[in-house]
């Protein structure tokens, strides 16, 4: 992604199967607090880690207890990404992040080393017209199913959910496969 670019719309991803899982399962949004407690900018969020590494090394795929119910959805999204991006790669982290109504993700830059090694994507699963994502000086209302690459390690970014409903995004990191992989 170009250093100056803040958002890059990549296409649309079908999130119907993920929404079905979301609606049919009682997901535990409260037990995983690492992200919220480690990074003050995420204090208002709730995270459901599915593929996640608290060391941020992402050298081996670490999956959570809920991975099996999401495995086919993640596999489908990975295949869609390969087609949309026209490149071979793999999802190395995948989480659902809930930003409750009237809450915010504070302005921050993803400064950890992994942020420059992988491409960060957001896909809204649930949202509303008053949820605004800002990267640098550019703000957008991201729509359900849109695939957005976010320049998270070069620009300050934040989110404010001014709506009356929660916002849930897939946040994932994509590793492009190289000949040495």
Placement of each model-derived feature along the sequence:
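Conserved short histidine dyad/triad with adjacent acidic residue
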Residues: 96-115
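Intrinsic-disorder/low-complexity, polar/charged segments enriched in Ser/Thr/Lys/Arg/Asp/Glu/Gln
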Residues: 2-8, 118-120, 169
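Short connector loops at helix/strand junctions that flank enzyme active sites
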Residues: 89-91, 100-102, 116-120, 126-128
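A short hydrophobic beta-strand segment most commonly corresponding to one strand
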Residues: 119-124, 149, 164-180
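A short beta-strand-loop-beta hairpin characteristic of the jelly-roll/cupin
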Residues: 124-144
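Non-cytosolic beta-sheet module surface loops
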Residues: 111, 124-125, 161
């Amino acid at each position: 992604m170009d250093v100056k670019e803040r958002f890059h719309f990549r296409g649309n991803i079908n999130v119907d199967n993920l929404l079905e899982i979301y609606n049919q399962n009682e997901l535990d949004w409260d037990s995983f607090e690492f992200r919220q407690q480690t990074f003050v900018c995420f204090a208002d969020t709730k995270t459901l880690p599915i593929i996640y590494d608290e060391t941020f090394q992402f050298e081996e795929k670490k999956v959570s207890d809920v991975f099996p119910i999401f495995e086919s959805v993640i596999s489908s999204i990975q295949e869609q990404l390969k087609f949309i991006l026209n490149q071979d790669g793999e999802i190395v982290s995948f989480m659902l992040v809930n930003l409750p109504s009237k809450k915010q993700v504070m302005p921050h830059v993803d400064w950890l080393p992994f942020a420059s090694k992988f491409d960060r994507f957001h896909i809204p699963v649930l949202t509303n017209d008053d949820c605004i994502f800002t990267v640098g000086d550019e703000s957008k209302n991201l729509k359900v199913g849109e695939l957005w690459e976010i320049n998270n390690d070069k620009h300050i970014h934040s989110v404010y959910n001014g709506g009356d409903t929660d916002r849930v995004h897939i946040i994932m990191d994509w590793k492009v496969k190289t000949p040495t992989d």
